[in-house]
């Protein structure tokens, strides 16, 4: 499988959310899903009284999603790339002011020696289904204490045990530091 360059999925430019299109025939602000050119786009409202709008785009067969959040006027607030359909940012995280001007670009890779691509390879080698709704990859970074982890949650097997697996990989070298196995109740 071809290695995806997640750094090319977003840019630092201002963007706008089409509020009129989202709200057309959608008074309750229900989530909308659509597929455009092999990209699944989910749009929804969030926050109190729809104070923000969120768009999550995932290409077919991609291990990454693009998360974008917009204010009530439709101007971009922030955007970043995540592991497929989750919150943990990888690469650059772009933050924008109320006028849509870029205010910060945070490097989410700082402190991690083990790359997102290496985590994906680890999952493939360990038969973890990256495209299952039961699988998610999160990240934890405590820069003050220099603690960095990837947290992989999936439904499956680990060393002869089956259930919900929660695996903590060292963010520096990728070694599993802790693995929890919970009965899935199946």
Whereabouts are the PLM-identified features?
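Periodic aromatic/glycine/histidine/acidic cluster detector
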Residues: 1-85, 89-95, 101-108, 115-142, ...
């Amino acid at each position: 499988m071809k290695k995806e360059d997640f750094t090319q999925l977003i840019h630092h430019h201002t963007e706008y959310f089409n509020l009129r299109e989202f709200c057309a025939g959608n008074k309750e602000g229900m989530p909308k899903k659509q597929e455009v050119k092999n990209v699944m786009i989910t749009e929804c409202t969030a926050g109190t009284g729809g104070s923000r709008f969120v768009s999550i785009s995932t290409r077919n067969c991609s291990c990454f999603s693009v998360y974008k959040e917009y204010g009530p006027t439709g101007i971009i607030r922030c955007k970043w790339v995540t592991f497929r359909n989750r919150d943990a940012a990888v690469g650059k995280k772009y933050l924008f002011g109320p006028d849509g001007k870029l205010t910060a670009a945070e490097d989410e890779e700082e402190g991690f020696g083990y790359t997102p691509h290496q985590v994906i390879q680890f999952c493939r080698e360990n038969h973890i289904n990256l495209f299952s709704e039961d699988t998610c990859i999160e990240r934890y970074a405590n820069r003050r204490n220099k603690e960095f982890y990837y947290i992989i949650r999936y439904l499956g097997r680990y060393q002869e045990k089956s259930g919900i697996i929660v695996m903590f990989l060292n963010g520096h070298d990728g070694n599993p530091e802790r693995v929890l196995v919970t009965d899935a109740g199946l």
